[in-house]
């Protein structure tokens, strides 16, 4: 295996590593699992038919997965994972967004020690839909989900237009960001 080069051998090694990690998690040999990117084409086999390791881990370990990406400057959770862009608006529901906000809040408290995390929620459409001119998901799905989460005690704010949110540096005002897609 050559590092950084996709190959069937590298895919098999990645799948074996993921299977071993699941065994170790089940045997309580691990407290946490951090994954790195995989080459989704190389890893496909009769034993691995998932669009990513997030889906594999959910199938093997059960539960509803929250994909989260972290750096020193940013923590980001994702509502939808590994689906075509054309399917995102059909996959978004108020309940799914509320669930992801609950999961993200729980992780921020348990894993990062943030007592009352503030979460920014990004819009799906450009300019946060511009009042329905560029899409209705913000008004019919995302904003009601943010309001419901807030009523449950989650400090969720938005939806914010994704393009301007990062360019303006507003992400620094929050402990995490919830985006609609990966």
Where are the predicted features?
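Short, acidic/small-residue loops that bind anionic groups at enzyme active sites
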Residues: 45-72, 150
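Contiguous, glycine/small-aliphatic-enriched amphipathic segments in soluble metabolic enzymes
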Residues: 1-52, 95-180
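A broad detector of the eukaryotic-type serine/threonine protein kinase catalytic domain
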Residues: 43, 62, 81-86, 90, ...
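Ligand-binding beta-strand-loop-alpha-helix segment within the catalytic cores
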Residues: 69-99
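Proline-centered loop/turn at the N-terminus of a beta-strand
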Residues: 32, 64-66, 75, 155
